[in-house]
Amino acid sequence: MLITDEQFASVRGTVMDANPDMAAQMAGRIVDEGLKFVAACAKNPGLGLAPSRIVDEGWHALILHTALYAELCDTLGDQFVHHYPGYDPTNYDPPILDRTREKITELGWEADQELWGPPSDETLASVAAKCQHAPDCTIIITPRPKPGVA
């Protein structure tokens, strides 16, 4: 989709390393949603968006692949999507997640609704990520400074 199959497998492996009991299919779904989330943020700078707790796990895995993540952000329009974690996993604002899913849909993808639920719902997947983003921690994109420009 936005990265090569080899890169995808590597990021999926990172999700599985952090969540040893997780099936490869679920980890792949989480990476897919993380990619969609980053794209939605990069294409909508200035609009506060946030991932669900499960999708945040995929975003974390992408970020750990620093070169891949920087290249992804460049590909998406040179909008580096920074991560500002909110550490209270009970922080949950459904309208922000609704807005984020709408932006994903506007880009031509379908959000995997099962992965965009409340942080307390671990029936589908329990993830290592324990942060949840809320109104005071939505993601606002700022352009990355160009090398040599102060």
Predicted regions located by residue number:
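Intrinsically disordered, low-complexity, repeat-rich regions
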Residues: 1-150
